[in-house]
Amino acid sequence: MASFSILSIFKIGVGPSSSHTIGPMEAGARFCGLLKGILEQVERVQITLHGSLALTGKGHLSDEAVLIGLHGIYANELDITTKKALLHEAFENKVLKLANQHHIPFDYAKDLIFDNKPLARHQNALILKAFNAKNEVLKEETYYSVGGGFVYTEKELDNLSEEGENESVAYDFSSAKELLELCQKHQKSIAEIVRLRENALKNHPDATMTKIYHAMLECYHNGANSKERYLPGSLKVTRLAPSVKTRLEKHPTSGKDPLALIDYISLYARSIAEENASGGKVVTAPTNGACAVVPSVLSYAKNHLFENLSQKSINDFLLTSAAIGYLYKKNASLSGAEAGCQAEIGVASSMAAGGLAHLCQATTQQVLIASEIAMEHHLGLTCDPVGGLVQIPCIERNVLGAIKAISASKLALEDEYKPKVSLDEVIATMYATGKDMNEKYKETSLGGLAKTLKC
């Protein structure tokens, strides 16, 4: 496998979930690649969603996502017109155009199986099988959607473990302690270390972050200006961002309320989280369920803290945030199904706090402290999406995650602040807490608000 790019913490895709929408779509598209040379022999495909993918798959659109993927389409390539046409063919005409080349019959009730039992390797798993006319299996593969849109086969997961032992990447780091030592050794910021690492891998950090930033802006614009009154699904949740935007345009907050800026932070976060919930184009940061925290904190900095924030500074914020996200992916989890919402909103808040601290001229140590504080106060946060939808409590959690990130950054910048807990320690604690958490509270919609709220 190619060396992991820290830049991939941010991915352009579609809502409402990175693990349950982007991941299954990629699995379907990758499975098409395995059918080269035997595609014309395929008469039927069978999809089995396991664990959290089965329990919340319909609300998270996992079923639709894998069907789109089986047409050979990835999330960053999908447009709404194509999506509607493919799903109409699958659900109404009962036909799939496998790999966008070969038509096969499709029966949703028989060919798409929801198995609530998780596989041993991860809570988010799906098995894809292709059969010939004799009902013999031509090809079979198991995929694990481990959070943040990252998808691996069994073999790839094994290789990930081996890479950690065998592969050497310039300017790489496995812990916050190693990252701090790198920054001190080379007299570089976290963002500069990430640039050096990604350039060594022949990637394009600044061009990529600029593209990511503009995708975030587009998502905000679409959410803030949506003409839809309600989000999709049975909950009939009202899209509030457009009305908040209209109110703030007509009656900008005055200096009388020292906390008035919270309204703007809420607008930024709500716009993006609501657009994600509607299945729109979004950026994983590090997941779809937590996609609004990082960009809303960045918008707060750009629109209210700094005049004329340069594109380089914006990229620095994103690269710093990505480095923090990388530490969680490497040493813990980005999956609500594996570690609860602390692995999504908690990680996003930690990332945003570090990025903002960097913009505020923090030392590397202070950046890491800010990230630690933000996660420390998300520990134990459950993932209990009501109705299997990424709406309640997800949208408002993005707002509060952004506010916590800003508060954490300010705390870390106090000169006399002497932390007792390191970022590495809080990452380990988050993962251990997630492993101990009851499965009802890990993206199954079997406990918490999902159980209490009748919908």
From Swiss-Prot:
EC nos: 4.3.1.17
Keywords from the UniProt entry: 4Fe-4S, Gluconeogenesis, Iron, Iron-sulfur, Lyase, Metal-binding
GO molecular function per UniProt: 4 iron, 4 sulfur cluster binding; L-serine ammonia-lyase activity; metal ion binding
Catalytic activity, reaction form: L-serine = pyruvate + NH4(+)
InterPro entries xref list: ASB_dom_sf, Fe-S_L-Ser, Fe-S_L-Ser_mono, Ser_deHydtase-like_asu, Ser_deHydtase_bsu
Cofactor(s) demanded: [4Fe-4S] cluster
Pathway: Carbohydrate biosynthesis; gluconeogenesis
Record-level GO BP terms: gluconeogenesis
Domain of life of the organism encoding this protein: Bacteria
Cofactor binding summary note: Binds 1 [4Fe-4S] cluster.
Family stated for the protein in its record: Belongs to the iron-sulfur dependent L-serine dehydratase family.
Protein name: L-serine dehydratase
Organism in which the protein naturally occurs: Helicobacter pylori (strain J99 / ATCC 700824)
Gene name in the database record: sdaA
